Amino acid sequence: MEGSKTSNNSTMQVSFVCQRCSQPLKLDTSFKILDRVTIQELTAPLLTTAQAKPGETQEEETNSGEEPFIETPRQDGVSRRFIPPARMMSTESANSFTLIGEASDGGTMENLSRRLKVTGDLFDIMSGQTDVDHPLCEECTDTLLDQLDTQLNVTENECQNYKRCLEILEQMNEDDSEQLQMELKELALEEERLIQELEDVEKNRKIVAENLEKVQAEAERLDQEEAQYQREYSEFKRQQLELDDELKSVENQMRYAQTQLDKLKKTNVFNATFHIWHSGQFGTINNFRLGRLPSVPVEWNEINAAWGQTVLLLHALANKMGLKFQRYRLVPYGNHSYLESLTDKSKELPLYCSGGLRFFWDNKFDHAMVAFLDCVQQFKEEVEKGETRFCLPYRMDVEKGKIEDTGGSGGSYSIKTQFNSEEQWTKALKFMLTNLKWGLAWVSSQFYNK
């Protein structure tokens, strides 16, 4: 509801809208002069058969202004009933709506508000008594009436069909009735028979249902067992594959280990660890040159490393034979190896040197080389105790510290550096390494199987 007010004329214009299309409406002029009787007629409830009481008299119906409920009995047992239409506003008033203008006497705002409230309440009451919301515009009302006419036609057609069926039933004679009674009895017997069959079928259905439940339960149990067996089979298959892989891996490792074992059995540890050879005029051990020449000044670090390998070789051969050297003890210590005097524990004979002027005046290095030559001589004598035919290619004179070339020039070469040339010292060291190589070969041949 919309409203507007003009201060000059003190006029309130109020518009209602259609409850279907929401278009503004103009009320009929009759709404301006609504009295109490007219409002009661518009708001009176619709009369239905459910509202009519059995004890109401014709006089009460007449006084109430409602048309009576008419029932016309007939001899054929069929009652004709006529239900009068509900009393409502005329078509003209139903199609005319919504505007409350100014009061005829120029009433106050209270009068206008009261009229608006009365009109609004009137529409609310009318909407509450039917399935249609009020107010409606003329077009929506026409549409609604068309729909109601269609429903009325459908209802009248149904009524005509019922009447025709009733007339057909009334025209049936007695014979048809007896025949129908017989057919009815036969159908009743057939019904009993079918009911009995249905009961039997129902019993069988219950039995089959119980059996089906048992079979389904058994099938479900078997499915679960099958799934469990499948999982176990898959797990065992996985374990088998893993074990097969492990077995193949172990077999490969065994073959590799056997190959390595066969290779190691054929490998001489001493020959593999200590490779003694020569490089020109130098004797070498593990590619370290032992000695130096004026034309080839070998670094002392390399010479010291060669002496360390030589000490380690003799120490390993002695341990293999169980030989304990007299007078000296070998101490392999890399390029700082030395010999320890057994008669004087505090005396160490270094088998390494840094060169320089001190090298010419310090005779500890020479004493250490002579002591080492003494240990080689003890090793030779120990071997000759068990093998009389054993003989080294170069004879050693420990007291003089020299090595003799018995199979060659017949000369002797000093292992000392003082008062000796580098050529002779280098040749003496080369002969000493050759003797150690022979000793290495003998130990390898004697202790190879062990």
From Swiss-Prot:
Q: How is this chain modified after translation?
A: Phosphorylation at Thr-119 by DAPK1 reduces its interaction with BCL2 and BCL2L1 and promotes induction of autophagy. In response to autophagic stimuli, phosphorylated at serine residues by AMPK in an ATG14-dependent manner, and this phosphorylation is critical for maximally efficient autophagy. Polyubiquitinated by NEDD4, both with 'Lys-11'- and 'Lys-63'-linkages. 'Lys-11'-linked polyubiquitination leads to degradation and is enhanced when the stabilizing interaction partner VPS34 is depleted. Deubiquitinated by USP10 and USP13, leading to stabilize the PIK3C3/VPS34-containing complexes. Polyubiquitinated at Lys-402 with 'Lys-48'-linkages. 'Lys-48'-linked polyubiquitination of Lys-402 leads to degradation. Deubiquitinated by ATXN3, leading to stabilization.
Q: Where is this cross-link: Glycyl lysine isopeptide (Lys-Gly) (interchain with G-Cter in ubiquitin)?
A: K402, K437
Q: GO CC annotations? A: autophagosome; cytoplasm; cytoplasmic side of mitochondrial outer membrane; cytosol; dendrite; endoplasmic reticulum; endoplasmic reticulum membrane; endosome
Residue span of region Disordered: 48-72
Q: Which InterPro entries match?
A: Atg6/Beclin, Atg6/Beclin_C_sf, Atg6/beclin_CC, Atg6_BARA, BH3_dom
Which cellular compartments is it found in?
Answer: Cytoplasm; Golgi apparatus, trans-Golgi network membrane; Endosome membrane; Endoplasmic reticulum membrane
Ranges where the record places region Required for membrane-association:
425-450
Note the effect listed for D149E.
Abolishes in vitro cleavage by CASP3
Phosphothreonine modified-residue sites: T119
Q: Which UniProt keywords apply?
A: Acetylation, Antiviral defense, Apoptosis, Autophagy, Cell cycle, Cell division, Coiled coil, Cytoplasm, Cytoplasmic vesicle, Endocytosis, Endoplasmic reticulum, Endosome, Golgi apparatus, Host-virus interaction, Isopeptide bond, Membrane, Mitochondrion, Nucleus, Phosphoprotein, Ubl conjugation
Q: Which Pfam families match?
A: APG6, APG6_N, BH3
User: Where is the segment annotated Interaction with BCL2 and BCL2L1 isoform Bcl-X(L)?
Assistant: 112-159
Region feature (Evolutionary conserved domain (ECD)): 245-450
Q: What residues bear N-acetylmethionine in this entry?
A: M1
Which residues are annotated as modified residue Phosphoserine in the UniProt record? S15, S30, S90, S93, S96
Entry comment describing in which tissues the protein is expressed: Ubiquitous.
Q: Where is this motif: BH3?
A: 108-127
A single GO BP: response to iron(II) ion
Give the way it sits in the membrane: Peripheral membrane protein
The miscellaneous remark of the record is: Expanded poly-Gln tracts inhibit ATXN3-BECN1 interaction, decrease BECN1 levels and impair starvation-induced autophagy.
Q: What is known of its domains?
A: The coiled coil domain can form antiparallel homodimers and mediates dimerization with the coiled coil domains of ATG14 or UVRAG involved in the formation of PI3K complexes. The C-terminal evolutionary conserved domain (ECD) contains poly-Gln-binding domains such as the ATXN3 poly-Gln motif, consistent with structural docking models revealing two highly scored poly-Gln-binding pockets in the ECD. As some binding is observed with BECN1 lacking the ECD, other domains of BECN1 may also interact with ATXN3.
Could you tell me what this protein does?
A: Plays a central role in autophagy. Acts as a core subunit of the PI3K complex that mediates formation of phosphatidylinositol 3-phosphate; different complex forms are believed to play a role in multiple membrane trafficking pathways: PI3KC3-C1 is involved in initiation of autophagosomes and PI3KC3-C2 in maturation of autophagosomes and endocytosis. Involved in regulation of degradative endocytic trafficking and required for the abscission step in cytokinesis, probably in the context of PI3KC3-C2. Essential for the formation of PI3KC3-C2 but not PI3KC3-C1 PI3K complex forms.
Self-association and partners:
A homodimeric form is proposed to exist; this metastable form readily transits to ATG14- or UVRAG-containing complexes with BECN1:UVRAG being more stable than BECN1:ATG14. Component of the PI3K (PI3KC3/PI3K-III/class III phosphatidylinositol 3-kinase) complex the core of which is composed of the catalytic subunit PIK3C3, the regulatory subunit PIK3R4 and BECN1 associating with additional regulatory/auxiliary subunits to form alternative complex forms.
Write out the similarity annotation: Belongs to the beclin family.
Q: What is this protein called?
A: Beclin-1
The taxonomic lineage of its organism, from the top, reads:
Eukaryota, Metazoa, Chordata, Craniata, Vertebrata
